[in-house]
């Protein structure tokens, strides 16, 4: 399931999720437990962040998006593998979501047809806002 960050909407809102991540705390987690990257992010998500001089804000924004998706689905953190929610970029660089595995199954059960996602980050905070749109 893929979603674009913008475009014409025609369905009803199924769920909304917002999450904020403290970049400093997230950076400290990555330094203390480097293996956590493999549990939270896909290879392409990490590759996108790794080209930055400081990957922590980009990774924190992607983690916020994953949590926001689970909130929009109305489920808890353990309901799906974080790697089942992948933040990609469209041809213009805008974020989009691709769900797989249990996350995709949960979205299908709830009739989610489309996702809208917005990400932002500074050196200190990363925020993601997600809207799940259901079939008409």
Please give the residue ranges for each predicted region.
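Core catalytic alpha/beta fold that binds nucleotide/phospho-ligands
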Residues: 1-136
